Amino acid sequence: MLKFILIFSFSIIVTTAKAQTGKLPCSNPVYRQFDFWIGEWEAFGPDGKKAGDSKISVILDSCIIFEEWTSASLQQGLRYAGKSFNTYNAATKQWQQTWVDNVGGTNEYMQGKFQNNQIIYTSTPFKFTKDSMAIRKMTFTNISPVKLRQHGEISMDKGISWSTEYDLEYRRKK
């Protein structure tokens, strides 16, 4: 019952705040920093081969940038696919991403910032092997209205040095 009361009270507060301001909660311009990613894209690796397709849309009253990824090729008989939820957290003033995929994988990037036409995400340390920890960094660079770069890196030494896990060039579909 307490849970119901809290949820009901929160919905009244949000509805009242929206009615008083006439704006949606995520209408602040900071929520639009990642809009350069919105659209339908083909992604290519450094070798020029197509890596996959990505559809990026805005959901939940413009609060979430939602990614739907599908690989171009089969891997062990499976077409790899995943989804991510990206949002700006006003409390921490950080961008955040949660990724889930069809092989049971997840990644969480709880720290992200917008600077120099880029969104740069960093994960919290996670167990990489039985005896080692790692950190992931993922950078989205807005190159032009029809092209962007997604660069994934990993560090095994607490962020001192980084190795590329993937490097993708996104080309907007026509």
Positions of the model-derived regions?
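Hydrophobic small-molecule pocket/channel-lining residues, especially in calycin-type beta-barrels
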Residues: 19-174
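Bacterial Sec-dependent N-terminal signal peptides
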Residues: 1-23
